[in-house]
Amino acid sequence: MEFEVKSPILGFESVRGMRLEKIDDLFMKLKNAEADSPVFTLVNPFLLREYDFEIPLAMKVLLDLKENTNLLVLNIMIIHTPLESSTVNFLAPVIFNFDNHTMGQLVLESHRYPAYGLAETISSFFNSDSTPTQEA
């Protein structure tokens, strides 16, 4: 599904359209709709940990978010080898509005969300049997 970028992903301000593709319940891929790059691996944070933040009014207006908006929140994951050492950025969620096909990255204030890191290792959220430690 294609989305219009209303608040760009940091470092990719010129990208205006992105395509979201589901891999499975935990992972998705986000690709530039008009070029070969950038391509991001995204993760559903709610399947990994308790994750809650306030969406500022400016972002709500930009994405036209309402009380009943069909939205999805994902986080960018940096893939490493081995996969268990891959990291997740919980301080800059990507928000998708499925009702109007808009999206944007929100940068959270680290002092307001000290439990969230820029590069948290994904293995810290899994038990030894490879299942997430908690579900939302």
Swiss-Prot record:
Gene3D superfamilies: BH3618-like (2.30.290.10). It is found in: Cytoplasm. It comes from the Bacteria. Pfam families: FliW. One of its GO terms (biological process) is bacterial-type flagellum assembly. Keywords: Bacterial flagellum biogenesis, Chaperone, Cytoplasm, Translation regulation. This is Flagellar assembly factor FliW 2. It comes from Wolinella succinogenes (strain ATCC 29543 / DSM 1740 / CCUG 13145 / JCM 31913 / LMG 7466 / NCTC 11488 / FDC 602W) (Vibrio succinogenes). The gene is fliW2.
